[in-house]
Amino acid sequence: ADPTFGFTPLGLSEKANLQIMKAYD
């Protein structure tokens, strides 16, 4: 889930990806 790519393997947007990273931080 690296925001540098802008997409997770699940195809989520960068913004959603950042929210996920914060949730698991």
Swiss-Prot record:
- Free-text description of this protein's post-translational modifications in UniProt: SBTX is known to be glycosylated but it is not known which one of its two subunits is modified; contains 5% carbohydrates.
pH dependence statement:
Activity decreases below pH 5.5 and above pH 8.0.
From its record, what is one biological process in GO terms? defense response to fungus
Keywords for the protein's UniProt record, in alphabetical order: Antimicrobial, Disulfide bond, Fungicide, Plant defense, Toxin
Single GO molecular function:
toxin activity
Give expression by tissue. Expressed in seeds, leaves, roots and stem (at protein level).
- Expression induction: In seeds, induced by jasmonate.
Organism domain of life: Eukaryota
Q: What does this protein do?
A: Involved in plant defense. Inhibits spore germination in C.sojina, A.niger (at concentrations >50 ug/ml) and P.herguei but not in F.oxysporum and F.solani. Does not inhibit vegetative mycelial growth. Inhibits growth of C.albicans and K.marxiannus but not P.membranifaciens or C.parapsilosis. Probably acts by affecting the cell membrane. Does not have urease, chitinase, beta-1,3-glucanase or hemagglutination activities. Does not inhibit trypsin. Injection into mice produces toxic effects such as dyspnea, tonic-clonic convulsion and death.
Miscellaneous comment in the UniProt entry for this protein: On the 2D-gel the determined pI of SBTX is: 8.2, its MW is: 44 kDa.
Share what the entry says about its subunit structure, partners included: Heterodimer of a 27 kDa subunit and a 17 kDa subunit; disulfide-linked.
Q: What is this protein called?
A: Soybean toxin 27 kDa chain
